[in-house]
Amino acid sequence: MASKNNIFDIIVVGAGPGGSFAAKASAENGYKTLLIDKELISEKGRYKACGGAIAWELVEEINYPEEKIARVIESLELHHVDGEHYSKKGKGAVIWRSVFDKYLTDNAIESGAIFKEKEPLISIHKSNDTYQITTSKSTYKAKYVIAADGVTSQTLKYLKWPYFRSEDLILTITKEMKTSKSYIDKFLGLDTVHLFFGIELIPIGYAWLFPKTETITMGWGNQINLVKNSREEFDKFASLSFVKEALKDSEMTIYKPHLIPVGLRPKLYEDNVFAVGDAGGIVDPISGKGIPYAMMSGQLAIESIKTCEKRDKLDKLGVIYERNLDKKFLKILKAKRIARDGIFQNDENLKKFLKLWETYRSSQIVMRNLI
Protein backbone atom coordinates (compact mmCIF):
# COMPACT_ATOMS: atom_id res chain seq x y z
CA MET A 1 0.00 0.00 0.00
CA ALA A 2 1.13 3.54 -0.73
CA SER A 3 1.45 5.68 2.41
CA LYS A 4 -0.12 9.16 2.43
CA ASN A 5 3.30 10.65 1.61
CA ASN A 6 3.42 8.47 -1.50
CA ILE A 7 0.16 9.73 -3.00
CA PHE A 8 0.60 12.30 -5.78
CA ASP A 9 -1.45 14.12 -8.40
CA ILE A 10 1.00 13.37 -11.21
CA ILE A 11 3.82 10.83 -11.49
CA VAL A 12 6.44 11.38 -14.18
CA VAL A 13 8.54 8.35 -15.10
CA GLY A 14 11.94 9.22 -16.59
CA ALA A 15 14.09 12.26 -15.77
CA GLY A 16 15.29 13.08 -19.27
CA PRO A 17 14.45 16.45 -20.87
CA GLY A 18 10.77 15.55 -21.41
CA GLY A 19 10.21 14.14 -17.93
CA SER A 20 12.07 16.86 -16.04
CA PHE A 21 10.34 19.62 -18.02
CA ALA A 22 6.94 17.98 -17.39
CA ALA A 23 7.70 17.65 -13.65
CA LYS A 24 8.75 21.31 -13.48
CA ALA A 25 5.55 22.46 -15.24
CA SER A 26 3.46 20.15 -13.06
CA ALA A 27 4.92 21.45 -9.78
CA GLU A 28 4.68 25.07 -10.95
CA ASN A 29 0.97 24.53 -11.65
CA GLY A 30 0.38 23.38 -8.08
CA TYR A 31 0.21 19.63 -8.66
CA LYS A 32 1.84 17.33 -6.12
CA THR A 33 4.46 15.84 -8.42
CA LEU A 34 6.75 12.83 -8.29
CA LEU A 35 9.62 12.40 -10.78
CA ILE A 36 11.19 8.92 -10.87
CA ASP A 37 14.28 7.65 -12.69
CA LYS A 38 15.98 4.26 -12.75
CA GLU A 39 19.48 5.80 -12.83
CA LEU A 40 21.56 7.77 -10.32
CA ILE A 41 21.48 11.40 -11.47
CA SER A 42 22.04 13.59 -8.40
CA GLU A 43 25.85 13.38 -8.33
CA LYS A 44 27.17 13.84 -11.88
CA GLY A 45 24.16 13.07 -14.04
CA ARG A 46 24.08 9.91 -16.18
CA TYR A 47 25.55 9.32 -19.62
CA LYS A 48 23.15 9.31 -22.57
CA ALA A 49 24.15 8.37 -26.12
CA CYS A 50 23.37 11.60 -27.97
CA GLY A 51 25.19 13.95 -30.32
CA GLY A 52 24.11 16.70 -27.96
CA ALA A 53 23.56 19.55 -30.44
CA ILE A 54 20.85 22.03 -29.47
CA ALA A 55 19.69 25.34 -30.96
CA TRP A 56 20.83 28.55 -29.31
CA GLU A 57 17.16 29.56 -28.86
CA LEU A 58 16.79 26.64 -26.44
CA VAL A 59 19.92 27.67 -24.52
CA GLU A 60 18.38 31.12 -24.04
CA GLU A 61 14.87 29.87 -23.31
CA ILE A 62 15.94 27.73 -20.34
CA ASN A 63 18.78 30.06 -19.23
CA TYR A 64 21.28 27.24 -19.70
CA PRO A 65 24.61 28.41 -18.21
CA GLU A 66 27.32 28.95 -20.82
CA GLU A 67 29.92 27.28 -18.57
CA LYS A 68 27.92 24.05 -18.95
CA ILE A 69 28.21 24.16 -22.76
CA ALA A 70 30.88 21.85 -24.21
CA ARG A 71 31.22 23.90 -27.41
CA VAL A 72 29.40 26.82 -29.05
CA ILE A 73 28.56 26.08 -32.70
CA GLU A 74 28.17 28.52 -35.60
CA SER A 75 27.91 26.19 -38.61
CA LEU A 76 26.94 22.77 -39.88
CA GLU A 77 29.01 21.04 -42.56
CA LEU A 78 27.08 18.48 -44.64
CA HIS A 79 29.29 15.94 -46.42
CA HIS A 80 28.00 13.62 -49.14
CA VAL A 81 30.21 10.56 -49.59
CA ASP A 82 30.71 11.25 -53.30
CA GLY A 83 32.58 14.44 -52.36
CA GLU A 84 29.85 17.06 -52.61
CA HIS A 85 29.75 19.41 -49.68
CA TYR A 86 27.18 21.83 -48.25
CA SER A 87 27.37 24.41 -45.44
CA LYS A 88 24.64 25.70 -43.17
CA LYS A 89 25.04 28.65 -40.80
CA GLY A 90 23.29 28.80 -37.46
CA LYS A 91 24.23 29.26 -33.82
CA GLY A 92 23.88 26.33 -31.47
CA ALA A 93 25.55 24.50 -28.63
CA VAL A 94 26.94 21.02 -28.11
CA ILE A 95 26.22 19.73 -24.62
CA TRP A 96 26.85 16.60 -22.58
CA ARG A 97 23.47 15.06 -21.86
CA SER A 98 24.62 14.12 -18.35
CA VAL A 99 25.12 17.81 -17.53
CA PHE A 100 22.10 19.09 -19.49
CA ASP A 101 19.63 16.55 -18.10
CA LYS A 102 20.83 17.11 -14.52
CA TYR A 103 20.29 20.85 -14.95
CA LEU A 104 16.66 20.25 -16.00
CA THR A 105 16.10 17.74 -13.18
CA ASP A 106 17.49 20.22 -10.65
CA ASN A 107 15.09 22.85 -12.05
CA ALA A 108 12.16 20.47 -11.51
CA ILE A 109 13.23 19.83 -7.91
CA GLU A 110 13.65 23.57 -7.28
CA SER A 111 10.11 24.07 -8.60
CA GLY A 112 8.75 21.65 -6.00
CA ALA A 113 8.77 18.20 -7.63
CA ILE A 114 9.80 15.26 -5.44
CA PHE A 115 12.62 13.29 -7.10
CA LYS A 116 13.35 9.60 -6.56
CA GLU A 117 16.38 8.15 -8.32
CA LYS A 118 17.78 4.63 -8.72
CA GLU A 119 14.21 3.32 -8.65
CA PRO A 120 13.47 1.15 -11.69
CA LEU A 121 9.79 0.50 -12.38
CA ILE A 122 8.58 -2.98 -11.42
CA SER A 123 4.85 -2.70 -12.11
CA ILE A 124 2.02 -0.30 -12.88
CA HIS A 125 -1.70 -0.94 -12.70
CA LYS A 126 -4.92 1.05 -12.34
CA SER A 127 -7.53 0.67 -9.66
CA ASN A 128 -10.45 3.05 -8.92
CA ASP A 129 -9.22 5.92 -11.13
CA THR A 130 -5.75 5.76 -9.55
CA TYR A 131 -2.51 4.37 -10.93
CA GLN A 132 -0.33 2.40 -8.55
CA ILE A 133 3.33 2.36 -9.50
CA THR A 134 5.73 0.01 -7.78
CA THR A 135 9.49 0.58 -8.04
CA SER A 136 12.43 -1.33 -6.63
CA LYS A 137 12.08 0.69 -3.40
CA SER A 138 8.48 1.76 -2.86
CA THR A 139 4.89 2.07 -4.10
CA TYR A 140 3.31 5.34 -5.27
CA LYS A 141 -0.15 6.40 -6.41
CA ALA A 142 -1.38 9.16 -8.74
CA LYS A 143 -4.29 10.07 -10.98
CA TYR A 144 -2.07 10.91 -13.97
CA VAL A 145 1.09 9.29 -15.34
CA ILE A 146 3.56 10.87 -17.74
CA ALA A 147 5.60 8.20 -19.55
CA ALA A 148 8.90 9.94 -20.32
CA ASP A 149 11.09 6.87 -20.08
CA GLY A 150 12.33 6.71 -23.65
CA VAL A 151 11.84 4.69 -26.80
CA THR A 152 11.74 1.37 -24.91
CA SER A 153 9.42 2.82 -22.21
CA GLN A 154 8.84 0.26 -19.44
CA THR A 155 5.78 2.23 -18.34
CA LEU A 156 4.05 1.74 -21.68
CA LYS A 157 5.31 -1.84 -21.97
CA TYR A 158 3.66 -2.74 -18.64
CA LEU A 159 0.47 -1.01 -19.81
CA LYS A 160 0.63 -3.08 -23.03
CA TRP A 161 0.65 -0.10 -25.37
CA PRO A 162 1.57 -0.95 -28.99
CA TYR A 163 5.24 -0.55 -29.95
CA PHE A 164 6.80 1.26 -32.92
CA ARG A 165 6.91 -0.13 -36.45
CA SER A 166 10.44 -1.21 -37.44
CA GLU A 167 10.50 1.41 -40.22
CA ASP A 168 10.00 4.04 -37.51
CA LEU A 169 13.13 3.08 -35.56
CA ILE A 170 16.74 4.08 -36.18
CA LEU A 171 19.58 2.05 -34.70
CA THR A 172 22.42 4.35 -33.70
CA ILE A 173 25.95 3.64 -32.53
CA THR A 174 27.81 6.31 -30.60
CA LYS A 175 31.50 6.40 -29.76
CA GLU A 176 33.00 9.07 -27.52
CA MET A 177 36.53 9.71 -28.80
CA LYS A 178 38.92 11.54 -26.46
CA THR A 179 41.44 13.80 -28.18
CA SER A 180 42.97 17.25 -27.73
CA LYS A 181 41.05 20.51 -27.94
CA SER A 182 43.76 22.00 -30.17
CA TYR A 183 43.44 19.14 -32.69
CA ILE A 184 39.62 19.46 -32.79
CA ASP A 185 39.92 23.23 -33.31
CA LYS A 186 42.45 22.75 -36.09
CA PHE A 187 40.87 19.86 -37.99
CA LEU A 188 37.09 20.11 -37.43
CA GLY A 189 37.02 23.85 -36.75
CA LEU A 190 36.42 25.88 -33.62
CA ASP A 191 32.65 25.94 -34.00
CA THR A 192 31.50 23.36 -36.57
CA VAL A 193 29.59 20.07 -36.46
CA HIS A 194 29.87 17.61 -39.36
CA LEU A 195 27.15 15.35 -40.83
CA PHE A 196 27.74 12.59 -43.43
CA PHE A 197 25.20 11.36 -45.97
CA GLY A 198 24.97 8.93 -48.88
CA ILE A 199 22.52 6.14 -49.71
CA GLU A 200 25.37 3.68 -50.23
CA LEU A 201 26.85 4.59 -46.84
CA ILE A 202 23.56 4.72 -44.92
CA PRO A 203 20.30 3.94 -46.80
CA ILE A 204 18.01 5.92 -44.47
CA GLY A 205 19.94 7.96 -41.95
CA TYR A 206 23.26 9.72 -41.55
CA ALA A 207 26.46 9.80 -39.50
CA TRP A 208 28.08 12.59 -37.52
CA LEU A 209 31.11 14.06 -35.80
CA PHE A 210 30.10 16.45 -33.01
CA PRO A 211 33.03 18.17 -31.29
CA LYS A 212 32.79 18.81 -27.57
CA THR A 213 35.67 20.36 -25.58
CA GLU A 214 38.25 17.54 -25.75
CA THR A 215 36.02 14.81 -27.15
CA ILE A 216 34.52 14.07 -30.55
CA THR A 217 31.13 12.36 -30.41
CA MET A 218 31.14 10.01 -33.37
CA GLY A 219 27.79 8.57 -34.38
CA TRP A 220 26.02 6.55 -37.04
CA GLY A 221 22.31 5.85 -37.49
CA ASN A 222 20.34 3.73 -39.97
CA GLN A 223 16.73 2.51 -40.16
CA ILE A 224 16.77 -0.67 -38.09
CA ASN A 225 15.06 -3.00 -40.59
CA LEU A 226 17.71 -2.08 -43.20
CA VAL A 227 20.67 -2.87 -40.93
CA LYS A 228 22.41 -6.12 -41.87
CA ASN A 229 25.62 -5.85 -39.83
CA SER A 230 25.80 -2.73 -37.66
CA ARG A 231 29.51 -3.03 -36.83
CA GLU A 232 30.51 -3.44 -40.47
CA GLU A 233 28.26 -0.55 -41.53
CA PHE A 234 29.60 1.68 -38.75
CA ASP A 235 33.17 0.77 -39.73
CA LYS A 236 32.40 1.81 -43.32
CA PHE A 237 31.72 5.31 -41.97
CA ALA A 238 34.76 5.20 -39.68
CA SER A 239 37.00 4.33 -42.65
CA LEU A 240 36.12 7.50 -44.61
CA SER A 241 39.37 9.43 -45.05
CA PHE A 242 38.03 12.62 -43.41
CA VAL A 243 36.75 10.65 -40.41
CA LYS A 244 39.99 8.67 -40.04
CA GLU A 245 42.00 11.89 -40.06
CA ALA A 246 39.64 13.57 -37.56
CA LEU A 247 39.99 10.68 -35.14
CA LYS A 248 43.68 9.86 -35.48
CA ASP A 249 45.43 9.59 -32.10
CA SER A 250 42.04 9.67 -30.34
CA GLU A 251 41.01 7.16 -27.69
CA MET A 252 37.55 5.62 -27.34
CA THR A 253 36.06 6.16 -23.87
CA ILE A 254 32.45 5.03 -24.50
CA TYR A 255 30.73 2.74 -27.03
CA LYS A 256 26.93 2.74 -26.95
CA PRO A 257 24.19 1.43 -29.28
CA HIS A 258 20.84 3.22 -28.91
CA LEU A 259 17.42 3.35 -30.60
CA ILE A 260 15.82 6.58 -31.84
CA PRO A 261 12.17 6.68 -32.97
CA VAL A 262 11.48 8.57 -36.21
CA GLY A 263 7.74 8.03 -36.34
CA LEU A 264 4.96 8.28 -33.77
CA ARG A 265 3.94 5.48 -31.44
CA PRO A 266 0.48 4.26 -32.53
CA LYS A 267 -1.04 6.17 -29.62
CA LEU A 268 0.13 9.07 -27.46
CA TYR A 269 -2.58 9.06 -24.79
CA GLU A 270 -4.91 6.63 -23.07
CA ASP A 271 -6.79 6.74 -19.79
CA ASN A 272 -4.80 9.52 -18.03
CA VAL A 273 -1.44 8.26 -19.31
CA PHE A 274 0.60 10.47 -21.66
CA ALA A 275 3.55 9.45 -23.84
CA VAL A 276 6.06 12.30 -24.19
CA GLY A 277 9.39 12.64 -26.02
CA ASP A 278 11.00 9.45 -27.34
CA ALA A 279 8.41 7.32 -25.52
CA GLY A 280 5.84 8.70 -27.97
CA GLY A 281 8.18 8.91 -30.96
CA ILE A 282 7.93 12.70 -30.79
CA VAL A 283 11.18 13.26 -32.69
CA ASP A 284 12.17 15.00 -35.94
CA PRO A 285 12.05 12.11 -38.48
CA ILE A 286 14.71 13.66 -40.73
CA SER A 287 17.34 14.88 -38.26
CA GLY A 288 16.52 12.67 -35.27
CA LYS A 289 16.42 15.81 -33.09
CA GLY A 290 14.37 15.08 -29.99
CA ILE A 291 15.34 17.29 -27.03
CA PRO A 292 13.12 20.34 -27.72
CA TYR A 293 10.13 18.17 -28.72
CA ALA A 294 10.49 16.07 -25.57
CA MET A 295 10.48 19.23 -23.46
CA MET A 296 7.52 20.77 -25.28
CA SER A 297 5.46 17.57 -25.22
CA GLY A 298 6.10 17.21 -21.47
CA GLN A 299 4.90 20.75 -20.87
CA LEU A 300 1.88 20.33 -23.17
CA ALA A 301 0.78 17.19 -21.31
CA ILE A 302 0.58 19.22 -18.09
CA GLU A 303 -1.14 22.15 -19.82
CA SER A 304 -3.72 19.74 -21.27
CA ILE A 305 -4.49 18.34 -17.81
CA LYS A 306 -4.88 21.85 -16.39
CA THR A 307 -7.16 22.98 -19.26
CA CYS A 308 -9.41 19.92 -19.07
CA GLU A 309 -9.72 20.05 -15.29
CA LYS A 310 -10.59 23.76 -15.43
CA ARG A 311 -13.26 23.19 -18.10
CA ASP A 312 -14.46 19.90 -16.58
CA LYS A 313 -13.67 18.11 -19.85
CA LEU A 314 -11.43 15.26 -18.70
CA ASP A 315 -13.14 12.98 -21.22
CA LYS A 316 -11.47 15.12 -23.93
CA LEU A 317 -7.97 14.95 -22.43
CA GLY A 318 -6.42 12.85 -25.20
CA VAL A 319 -7.99 14.97 -27.95
CA ILE A 320 -6.80 18.21 -26.31
CA TYR A 321 -3.26 16.83 -25.80
CA GLU A 322 -2.90 15.78 -29.45
CA ARG A 323 -4.50 19.02 -30.66
CA ASN A 324 -2.01 21.03 -28.58
CA LEU A 325 0.87 18.95 -29.97
CA ASP A 326 -0.37 19.44 -33.54
CA LYS A 327 -0.69 23.21 -33.10
CA LYS A 328 2.80 23.54 -31.63
CA PHE A 329 4.86 21.25 -33.88
CA LEU A 330 3.45 17.74 -34.40
CA LYS A 331 1.71 18.58 -37.68
CA ILE A 332 5.15 19.48 -39.09
CA LEU A 333 6.80 16.31 -37.72
CA LYS A 334 4.07 14.19 -39.35
CA ALA A 335 4.70 15.93 -42.70
CA LYS A 336 8.44 15.37 -42.28
CA ARG A 337 7.87 11.65 -41.69
CA ILE A 338 6.10 11.42 -45.07
CA ALA A 339 8.78 13.55 -46.79
CA ARG A 340 11.62 11.51 -45.28
CA ASP A 341 10.90 8.46 -47.44
CA GLY A 342 11.15 10.56 -50.60
CA ILE A 343 14.32 12.37 -49.48
CA PHE A 344 16.15 9.08 -48.89
CA GLN A 345 14.73 7.39 -52.00
CA ASN A 346 17.92 8.11 -53.97
CA ASP A 347 21.04 10.30 -53.87
CA GLU A 348 19.57 12.80 -56.31
CA ASN A 349 16.70 13.58 -53.93
CA LEU A 350 19.03 13.55 -50.94
CA LYS A 351 21.43 16.06 -52.53
CA LYS A 352 18.55 18.29 -53.55
CA PHE A 353 17.42 18.32 -49.92
CA LEU A 354 20.95 19.04 -48.62
CA LYS A 355 21.31 21.91 -51.09
CA LEU A 356 18.01 23.42 -49.93
CA TRP A 357 18.97 22.83 -46.28
CA GLU A 358 21.87 25.26 -46.72
CA THR A 359 19.34 28.10 -47.01
CA TYR A 360 16.09 26.87 -45.46
CA ARG A 361 15.03 25.11 -42.28
CA SER A 362 13.98 21.52 -42.93
CA SER A 363 10.43 22.41 -41.81
CA GLN A 364 10.28 25.15 -44.49
CA ILE A 365 11.48 22.72 -47.17
CA VAL A 366 8.76 20.22 -46.26
CA MET A 367 5.85 22.56 -45.53
CA ARG A 368 6.47 24.69 -48.64
CA ASN A 369 6.85 21.56 -50.81
CA LEU A 370 10.26 22.70 -52.02
CA ILE A 371 11.32 19.12 -52.62
Model-found features: residue ranges?
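Predominantly flavin-linked oxidoreductase catalytic cores and closely associated redox partners
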Residues: 109-245, 281
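C-terminal helical "tail/cap" subdomain of flavin- and related membrane-associated enzymes
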Residues: 306-371
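N-terminal FAD cofactor-binding segment of flavoenzymes
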Residues: 40-76
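Beta1/beta-strand and adjacent pyrophosphate-binding region of the FAD-binding site
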Residues: 2-18
